């Protein structure tokens, strides 16, 4: 339809024109955003139906090396008032005004919108955030991360946040995008090991994580999980183990969220071991290539949480 065409073309056409016709020395993102306000007014007069994500609120999280996980809200619309709620209610012109990044404390149901002169500019952004024991914590894994997960800063560069990537940023992945999932090419018989230093003895009784199903892209969800604790980061004791079963759809991809609960235990170091979801058949489960007939499925993991 013409409306769909408008949505796909605008304001992309303006961005293409800006990058193609402007000298590199003169390119200015802030100035471009300021001029886009007038462009959208012109498009409205022309009865064009552009994509209006320009007016939406983007939800980012970021942790400095030793700091807590912070929530950052931004809109490309210049000088917009960002109003937000943390209880799942719809934001209004009288909701809390966003003035600076704030610490993520506990699980919140964040909703935010940009306002101008008391009027909501476009849609409400909805993003649950999970302020668990691991939120904002650096971690180590025993595999090289492929898809690195998180984005941060004005250029949204993949993997720019070196402390959290996609595993401890407080945001769970979903079916809509591969961001902020983190991928691991699993070797048969070798589990993924994720380790976090909690810095002090901490009571833990539950671990939650997500994994992705999409065999066409060589992904199967986790087949099992085990939890180990340590006081010194050297000697670990397993305190829980669980086999995982999932009902797969006929086609497409789906995100699964799994949890494992156990008797409260003290941990200074927490290790989560995630097992591969199994094997895939070359040319049957995914497009045929010159590789082996049977391969271990990749693990795509997001937001490992502890409570």
Residue ranges and their predicted role:
Residues 174-240, 254-307:
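Aromatic, loop-rich ligand-recognition surfaces of beta-strand-rich domains
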Residues 27-193, 212:
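Short, compositionally stereotyped local motifs that mark structural "simplifiers"
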Residues 13, 84, 112, 207, ...:
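Hydrophobic, well-ordered secondary-structure elements that form the walls
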Residues 13, 120-122, 282-288:
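Beta-sandwich strand segments
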Residues 238-248:
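Solvent-exposed serine/threonine-rich low-complexity stretches and specific carbohydrate-binding patches
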